[in-house]
Amino acid sequence: MAEKALLVCFGGMSNVGTLTGLAALELARAGEATIFCLASLANGDPVVKKRLEEAERIVAVDGCPLACARRIAERAGFPPHRSLVLSRDLGIAKGPPMAVGEEDVPRAVELIREALKVEAWANGEIP
């Protein structure tokens, strides 16, 4: 089965950056998606590139509007099928790295989970 790839910008320099990593880890632990190394993609790693070529879906998850994950993916030749920006999509103000609200993790997980659903994509439910 082809992987559902998550490209996550988890720099940990803000609460929304930290949130991207926490939510992605939860989905990876549940076997719902695979987190790909964004730095390896930026460095042109052939293994990461091959796996992304074979991925069923690619979702970029960024914390803030700088959209580093999406931009790195696009520059590497892998435009994501969906691009999420947690600060925008969940209405969370960017703040210090440790200021992640416990209530925000399940909200982020659900947003990413919906973006990964092939059915939602086919029906045009995910913008």
Regions inferred by a protein language model and the residue ranges of each:
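Iron-sulfur-associated redox domains of electron-transfer enzymes in respiratory
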Residues: 1-127
